Regions:
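Short, contiguous acidic/charged loop-to-helix segments that flank catalytic cores in large enzymes
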Residues: 47-56, 74, 108, 122, ...
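Conserved C-terminal motor-coupling region of P-loop helicases
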Residues: 100, 108, 136-148, 179-187
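A short beta-strand element within the Helicase C-terminal
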Residues: 117, 121-137, 154, 162-166
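Conserved SF2 helicase motif VI
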Residues: 143-163
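Conserved helicase motor "Helicase C" RecA-like lobe of SF1/SF2 P-loop NTPases
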Residues: 67-116
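Helicase-core coupling region on the C-terminal RecA-like lobe
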Residues: 1-68, 125-126, 159, 164-191
Length: 191
C-alpha cells in the first residue's frame, strides 16, 4: 500500500488496521515483480475487442500460482478460504488464463477461490493474493492501456496480503511509474 499511497495519494492512503500487518507466509515479501525481460516473451495483437495476449507470460503466471499454492499449502488455502485474484488489462489475456485454469485439473480444488478479470472488472474488489499479468513485451516500449495509471492504481491496490506482478521491465522501464514501482519492489526485496 505504501507505493500507491506515495504515487497517487501524497502519502495519505493507509491500509486498514486489520490487513496492515497481515501476511500469508512469515518470511514472504508483500509485493514481488517477476521480470520476464530475459525470457523472450512476446505479446500478440488479437483484435480491437480483445486487445493483446502474451501466452508465455500467462503460462508463467499459472506456474507461479501453483508454486505459491504449494508454499502456502492446499489444505490451509481451503480451510482459511484464502482467495486469489488474477488481473490483466487485456480481455484476450483474461480469457486465455480462464481457459487454462479451467483445463488444469490440479487447480480444480481452488477454482471457487479464483477470480480472473480485467482491471476494470476488478474495481471495488479485493483478494488475499493478487497476480497481475501486464502482457506488454515489445522492443518499442509501447505500453497501451498500461499508460492509464488510474487502472494501474486499481490493479495494484486489490491485494490484502500479497501482490505478484509479471511484466517485462525492459518494455515498461521507459515509463516513470513502472520504473519507480520496480525500484520500490526491488528495495523491499533487499531489506
Amino acid at each position: 500500500m505504501k507505493f500507491p499511497s506515495q504515487w497517487f495519494y501524497n502519502g495519505e492512503l493507509e491500509a486498514a488496521p486489520e490487513v496492515r500487518y497481515r501476511g500469508i507466509l512469515d518470511w514472504d515479501t508483500p509485493i514481488h515483480w517477476i521480470d520476464t525481460s530475459e525470457m523472450d516473451f512476446k505479446e500478440e495483437f488479437v483484435g480491437e475487442t480483445f486487445g493483446r495476449i502474451n501466452k508465455a507470460e500467462a503460462d508463467l503466471l499459472l506456474s507461479e500460482l501453483k508454486i505459491y499454492i504449494n508454499r502456502i499449502g492446499g489444505s490451509r488455502i481451503l480451510e482459511e478460504k484464502i482467495d486469489f485474484g488474477i488481473i490483466s488489462p487485456y480481455k484476450a489475456q483474461v480469457q486465455y488464463l480462464r481457459n487454462k485454469i479451467k483445463a488444469d485439473a490440479s487447480l480444480k480444488p481452488y477454482r471457487s477461490l479464483f477470480t480472473v478479470n480485467t482491471v476494470d472488472g476488478f474495481q471495488g474488489q479485493e483478494r488475499d493474493v493478487i497476480f497481475i499479468s501486464l502482457v506488454r513485451a515489445n522492443e518499442e516500449g509501447q505500453i497501451g492501456f498500461l499508460n492509464d495509471l488510474r487502472r494501474m492504481n486499481v490493479a495494484i491496490t486489490r491485494a490484502r496480503m500479497k501482490l505478484v506482478i509479471l511484466g517485462e521491465a525492459e518494455t515498461l522501464k521507459h515509463h516513470g511509474f513502472y520504473r519507480k514501482l520496480l525500484e520500490f519492489i526491488q528495495n523491499i526485496g533487499n531489506q
